[in-house]
């Protein structure tokens, strides 16, 4: 297929048109008075969203060059969402403002490479200043404030997330699911839960709830299949003498071994239950080791020279209780030593920092949560499916923003932190580098300007008032239309969100500004079918018979 090559200002202007169209669609969602965007779906009902990245992902432009520009900024929104969980609209608005201002200067003759260098230096200085302006999240109230702002000023969602974080801790896992009713709920699972249920319903102790409930059980951990009960007999005899229940966690328990355990359970010889070990392969071994550390036991592993026959009661873990249903096993208050659990937690945190795979990171974080806190499930309820999706998006955003705030701290919100950081930096740059730095500094007004515009206020007046305010915590509350102390009013943003949004915006804008040529496919119009209306139908061919 033939390709079209376009150079210099013409190429950059085309790319800018695409960026502008994407920005125009995304920017309307910004701030407490931002509007919704209605998105047509290829099937089913249209979706309504106020989530910047959801809007950006749907933008596909007809012109291939414009679409290239839009797709680069769309990538910025997605990357910002992946890294910080929020700030996608801020990143898009900043990228557009930097590109627009930079394009004007480069068209006027500035050197793109020097301009880029100045932009990078300004970005670095502002990020450093943002970190200085930040402070730690102090209490549950501030967590609720961050979540409320990110959830489009929905206090109920903010409080729900604050409750969840208080219960499972900052390392705990908080998941968001759709509720069966119209009400929002918070369910917290204390202790370690993994997704394996009982191997036989005959183990059930609570027929009403269809669960196995073991009080102060011993826990045997084995990393292979158990097919022969003979290997288990020595440890079973020791358990029987104590009169305590036993939970067996192994790769699998099959045939004769499982049947004999069930018979012993039904006859009342042993209060016993068995489940499969969670995970697969190396992850299964790691999770068994986690359970061993949590319960103060040891994994009986043939790789370490241990056989099931050699297991003693000292190798078994303990917990205050274990609850098993058909899908999940929950171990509450494992008897492991705190020092060993802390060491394991730190080891998993180090692995999270080193891994480059998103999937591995997610699985490691799940393991970390199960060891350190617990799991909270926020169930989001709504009257219609469309509202449910929109609300779930907001809860996901708020949850990510809250985690970012706990991780790196908070700054004043509403776009004011970027303006305050700009006022504090002093750069000694010359020529086109100074122009590059000035481009970034001017663009930092764009988020506040957009928030004010969406709320129906004069953006120039608002930006000027915030820039000239004597108190560095003063910003603009767009919901009320007042200048307030942002910290006292609870209008706060995670510094990570601001930092990541700025870094990604500068990165993509500088790439676009240093583009000198574009290569795109020439779309060829497919020939239309010839008009056959004049042939008079098949009847006119009768003479050929």
Curated annotation (Swiss-Prot):
Return one GO MF term: isomerase activity
Which InterPro entries is this protein grouped with?
Chaperonin_Cpn60_CS, Cpn60/GroEL, Cpn60/GroEL/TCP-1, GroEL-like_apical_dom_sf, GROEL-like_equatorial_sf, TCP-1-like_intermed_sf
Which Gene3D superfamilies does the protein's record reference? GroEL (3.50.7.10), GroEL-like equatorial domain (1.10.560.10), TCP-1-like chaperonin intermediate domain (3.30.260.10)
Question: Which keywords are on file for this protein?
Answer: ATP-binding, Chaperone, Cytoplasm, Isomerase, Nucleotide-binding
The record describes the protein's role as: Together with its co-chaperonin GroES, plays an essential role in assisting protein folding. The GroEL-GroES system forms a nano-cage that allows encapsulation of the non-native substrate proteins and provides a physical environment optimized to promote and accelerate protein folding.
Oligomer and partners = Forms a cylinder of 14 subunits composed of two heptameric rings stacked back-to-back. Interacts with the co-chaperonin GroES.
Q: What is the name attached to this protein's record?
A: Chaperonin GroEL
- Source organism (scientific name): Campylobacter jejuni subsp. jejuni serotype O:2 (strain ATCC 700819 / NCTC 11168)
- Gene transcribed to yield this protein: groEL
